Amino acid sequence: MRKALNIHPNNNPMYPKLLIVCLVLMINSANAQTSITAINVVGNTSVDSADYFLQKGLVEKQNGRRLESLKNFEKAAKYDGSSKAITAELASAYFDLRRYNQARESYKKLVELGDASAANYKQLMTLSYQLKQNDDVLLYADKLKRVDPTEKVYFYVGKVNYDMDNYGEAIKFLNEAAKENPENAEVPYMIAHSYADMMNYKLAIPYFQKAIQLDPAKNYWIYELGLICYAMHDDKNALKYILEAGEKGYKRDNDYLENLGIAYLNVGDLEQGVAMLVEILKRKPSDLNILKMVAEAYYYKGKYQQAIDYWDQVLTYDKTSATSLFMIGMAYQKKGEKEKGIALCDKAIEMDPTLAANKQKKMMAGL
């Protein structure tokens, strides 16, 4: 007969060890389950909190409380920064509150999150334009055009190239912009300015005229056209446009009066030309350049005594002006007082020997 095995716990030395192992496994399993539950709770809490602040922000937005809505969207973003819905509301709120730098960054993030829509690219293009981020304007204009070929981007591309003094590209894209929006007066104006900045005044003029035709109230454009005509020695049209600019409200400051005075003198209207320059002298009585200009205007119109009077004023402020003394001498000779005139010219030549050549030239030219 077999002997019965004794398996009583008290008699088995392995039993306590097995019991300990089982207890450890049970504790670890419970801890692991608790950790997983905690993670799920935290995750769910973050999502719930983000949605709570998002919904609260939407209510504030609907009630017209834009700043309060922004505060809630910012809180929502802290809980869930990868939410497209929250990022979109955040971008819109920043934009509405004119926080354009933050709006631009939010729209960039929205694109990074996968929302590469035409609307978002358009916002990025226009915000980059407002913030003078020229390279980004070109980048997002290209992306926008690829996503939606019907979008009008050429004005922005042309303007950026114009601002960067890249006139060739500016003219190319601005001509395309003119096709997209023929009524935008800024387009021909920038083309005109591009040609003018390259000293190609002949090509600039028709674009200035087109811009003014589209927006006749722009008195500064009219004034600029007058100056372009002046540079081309088109004195009649220079006077016409400078006068028109003044009639349409361009400020009659000293620069304007000087250019208007010169324009009058260039068409032979001594009285009006001098009147403009004298108006400047009321404000700037010791302006030597204007005094000399008036003196020369009188001299070349045969008004020799008036010329002498103004060159005398130059000498009052600058006794070393040999040229003014020389011209006074020439004026006296023209008046018939040759001896007095020659003596003054000789004295001027002593002060500045280079004037001797001028004397010879003027005598030969009968001036």
List each model region and its residues:
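N-terminal leader/linker segments that initiate helical-solenoid repeat arrays
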Residues: Y15, A30-N101, E105, E112, ...
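Terminal, low-structured helical/coil segments at or just beyond the last alpha-helical repeat
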Residues: S35-N44, N266, F326-L367
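TPR alpha-solenoid repeat register
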Residues: Y52, I86, N120, V153-Y154, ...
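Canonical tetratricopeptide repeat
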Residues: Q55, E89-S92, K122-T126, Y156, ...
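Register position in tetratricopeptide repeats
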Residues: Q62-N63, D96-L97, Q130-L131, D163-M164, ...
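Structural marker of alpha-solenoid helical repeat scaffolds
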Residues: Y79, E112-G114, R146-V147, E180, ...
